[in-house]
Amino acid sequence: MTWEVVIGLEIHAQLTTKTKIFSGSSIDYGAAPNTQANLLDLGMPGQLPVLNKAVIPKAIKLGLALGAKIGRRSVFDRKNYFYPDLPKGYQTSQFSFPIVDTGGVVEIEVDGEIKKIGVTRAHLEEDAGKSIHDAFPGQTGIDLNRAGTPLLEIVSEPDMRSAKEAVAYAKKMHELVQYLGICDGNMQEGSFRVDSNVSIHKPGTPFGTRAELKNINSFKFIEQAIELEIERQIEVLESGGKVVQETRLYDADKNETRSMREKEEANDYRYFPCPDLLPVVITEEDIEAIRAEMPEMPDAKRKRYVADFGLSDYDAAFLTGSRAMAEYFEAVVAKTNEAKVSANWVMGELSKSLNQKGIDISESPVSADMLAGLIERIQDNTISGKIAKQVFDGMWSGEGSADEIIEQKGLKQITDSSAIEALVNDVLANNAAQVEAYKGGQEKMFGFFVGQVMKASQGQANPAQVNQVLKDKLK
């Protein structure tokens, strides 16, 4: 039996502020439990919220990047429910008047096909605390450090039809919030969490009952969880059962989803405007001022790299994979004026070293200026490409700049024609049999001679000059 899959995602992006959305408590990750929660976060009576104004432009930036309508009058609402990590008994969120309204679109590419995914809305809200189950056998601990952390919840249309499409959309949104500088995207620390709403139905029939997969924190797990949920729903329906509207948790260790609770509808939360917070009024001048601060978006940057730098689509996509990577690459190009050579070094030796050490490019011991300095020494024939890799290793190990390492280790390329000719003469004199073989038609011996000259010069002879002198001598 053929089933059609329908998927919508709700992404919770933690905004990069110093303090919480309605209180002055810090949002630094990793503090001891309950050390970053003040009286408001604890739900104590008589405490009033004060909006952290820094969250407003961050939300508007996302709306502009998506091409969505910005809510000119944005209202905060109380979302009422009881859970141990929500001591107030309600979450301050947005319902009827979100800061980012309809019209947003994200383009994804899956299996070579471009697809547009609609974004329903994005609204501001406070995060809840965290329930800790493992540390207390038979009990649950509550850490309220996270309570009140500013979130932007980004809600997609149910436009995705496979787990692959859902992952592509999540990755695109992950890239976007990092480029905008509004979220650090750290999934391990919970800065970027994804809820997946999954249903199935027969083509031509209404959408089926959806189940929500909660708080998945890696792209791999998103795909696995959705695939499992699709299989589960098919099995339920084909065995004559009914899919229940519920929230389910994905267990990565057991690779299964399990029921957490029945899924609520909006009216179950009894939303009403928060009486303690005034509506936020956003003017055209506010929007234009924020638009002027917007960075170049990744899709536009990729197109520019292909058009202006002559890079391939693959290289452009790799180099724009993160804003930090793109900024590093552009800093190297600005100094060397060699886009393709710079791209090769960033994608090659630099990325290999970053991966081996497991660090981000922002933590690279080789700065963009240092890499540019190395490329300049290749360009002016101070060193060969082969020696350059040795110099890069020295730079990575903290031995200094390219110029310092070249000087300290005596790595300057031999370009003196008489010195190269002497090296060639020695190699040919010591390999008379190979010379005869070459002259007898074994042209592959030419590579042998080049290798011997480079070996004799410890890799420092200019390869182009070596080739030319050998050709002249072997005529």
From Swiss-Prot:
Tree of life domain: Bacteria
Regions annotated as coiled coil: none
Disulfide bonds: none
Gene Ontology biological process: glutaminyl-tRNAGln biosynthesis via transamidation; translation
First-tier enzyme category under EC: ligase
InterPro entries attached to this UniProt entry: Asn/Gln-tRNA_amidoTrfase_suB/E (IPR017959), Asn/Gln-tRNA_Trfase_suB/E_cat (IPR006075), Asn/Gln_amidotransferase (IPR018027), Asn/Gln_tRNA_amidoTrase-B-like (IPR003789), GatB (IPR004413), GatB_C_1 (IPR042114), GatB_Yqey_C_2 (IPR023168), Gln-tRNA_amidoTrfase_suB_CS (IPR017958)
Catalytic activity line of the entry: L-glutamyl-tRNA(Gln) + L-glutamine + ATP + H2O = L-glutaminyl-tRNA(Gln) + L-glutamate + ADP + phosphate + H(+); L-aspartyl-tRNA(Asn) + L-glutamine + ATP + H2O = L-asparaginyl-tRNA(Asn) + L-glutamate + ADP + phosphate + 2 H(+)
Pfam families tied to this protein: GatB_N (PF02934), GatB_Yqey (PF02637)
GO MF terms, alphabetically ordered: asparaginyl-tRNA synthase (glutamine-hydrolyzing) activity; ATP binding; glutaminyl-tRNA synthase (glutamine-hydrolyzing) activity
Annotated keywords: ATP-binding, Ligase, Nucleotide-binding, Protein biosynthesis
Enzyme Commission code(s) on record: 6.3.5.-
Family: Belongs to the GatB/GatE family. GatB subfamily.
PANTHER family hit by this protein: GLUTAMYL-TRNA GLN AMIDOTRANSFERASE SUBUNIT B MITOCHONDRIAL AND PROKARYOTIC PET112-RELATED, GLUTAMYL-TRNA(GLN) AMIDOTRANSFERASE SUBUNIT B, MITOCHONDRIAL
Job description of the protein: Allows the formation of correctly charged Asn-tRNA(Asn) or Gln-tRNA(Gln) through the transamidation of misacylated Asp-tRNA(Asn) or Glu-tRNA(Gln) in organisms which lack either or both of asparaginyl-tRNA or glutaminyl-tRNA synthetases. The reaction takes place in the presence of glutamine and ATP through an activated phospho-Asp-tRNA(Asn) or phospho-Glu-tRNA(Gln).
HAMAP family to which the protein is assigned, alphabetical: GatB (MF_00121)
Subunit comment: Heterotrimer of A, B and C subunits.
Record-given protein name: Aspartyl/glutamyl-tRNA(Asn/Gln) amidotransferase subunit B
Species whose genome carries this gene: Hydrogenovibrio crunogenus (strain DSM 25203 / XCL-2) (Thiomicrospira crunogena)
